[in-house]
Amino acid sequence: MPNVSVTSNTRFGKSVIVRPGTTIGHDNIIGAHTSITAGASIGSCINIGEGSFIGLKACIREYLTLGKYSMAAMGAVIVKDIGEGELWGGNPAKLMRIAKWKEVAST
């Protein structure tokens, strides 16, 4: 599983990290300083805000928006939009907490 698969018309911001085994669909926008961990599966037409974190083997359904500094926990199945600074986890994913801006500023 050492490969990353990215299909057409996906745009990456500066300093994006994509780990092995990740699949990324078409027509996505991935914001600067985002980290996508191993085995994540990202659908198509998704807008991921800057500074976001996609956990190990998380799945994100197509046509969604993840706000700046949002987080998808390990194994999360994201089927709804995520707001800025929100942490979602589970299957289907639910809001677990909202980051305090002091926490975001320290990352």
Predicted segments with their positions:
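Terminal amphipathic alpha-helical/low-complexity segments used for targeting or macromolecular assembly
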Residues: 91-107
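Structural signal for interior beta-strand "rungs" in well-ordered beta-sheet cores
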Residues: 1-89, 93-96
